[in-house]
Amino acid sequence: MNAEMAGRRAIKMVSEVVNFTVLLVVVLLLAYAFYSLWDSQQIYQAAEKSNYAIYKPTVENEGKTFKELQAINPEVIAWLSVYGTNIDYPLTQGQDNMKYVNTNAEGLYSLSGSIFLDYRNNKDFTDFNSIIYGHNMDKKAMFGEIDSFSDRRIFDTHQYGNLYFDGTDHSIEFFAFVHTDAYNSEILTPNVREEERQRYLDNLLAAATHKRAVNISTDDHIVLLVSCSSRSTNGRNILVGKVTDEINRVLSAQTDCIIVDQFSSNNENGSIMPIFLWHILLKLILALIITIRIYTIYHKQN
């Protein structure tokens, strides 16, 4: 009898240890899930264009607030806007192409990084082709809307932008959208030499998914807005525009872009839900199932 009772106590003790361990796992899963939500929210908040709105150069402030940002970080060289989108950010340039991958425009560490000009380009945009990079982020942050230009409707209704540098506004007229590989040196090489410009331009237009008729020559200056693609690991989406001294403040009538993030997947209705949120949701469901199981076992034993 004593042996039987001792056996039961041992089984109960083991069961309690198992239950406690499972409960601990549940708590850790919940803690991780909520931390992931908080952390991702912090990243997206840091990337919002509203964080830099006070620095945006305008006719009214004569660029004084922009100069204040340059005083904070001298590597801020310009301001880029794509009309009808949330792309409205200061533009930086480092001594390499790595610094501003995880540094914001104020020079502080940030996973959302900055929009930045290739270090091999001249900051006065006198090169034939200047390459500008930005993260493909959810919630229309940074270059999160470049991906949406693969939709012909979006491309057709978002034709203009603005590039402010050297104290002056310059118009951008977008004329091509290209999807290519990250290692395509025929397109992703900045500051092409004069004798190679026509071939470069021909290759660019031949690779374009969408394009419109714009007078463009080897004497012009073009910018390539480059971001990661949601379609492939090494894919790059590129919005190409011609920089002119003519100021065109025409806003696109279409402002509701269909955003596809590099970390997103489509459901049956075509809506977007980031994969990391699915992971968190599954962890929460698993934690709930385990908690119910522990509760059931505990009450059966008592």
Regions from the PLM with identified roles:
Residues 18, 257-284:
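Juxtamembrane/start-of-transmembrane alpha-helix segments at the extracytoplasmic/lumenal side
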Residues 14-31, 279-297:
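Alpha-helical transmembrane segments
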Residues 10-13, 43, 290:
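Intrinsically disordered, low-complexity regulatory regions
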Residues 1-15, 302:
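N-terminal Lys/Arg-rich, disordered targeting/topogenic segments
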Residues 20, 27-265, 293:
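Solvent-exposed, non-transmembrane regions of membrane-associated and secreted proteins
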Residues 5-8, 124, 272:
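N-terminal hydrophobic alpha-helix used for membrane targeting or insertion
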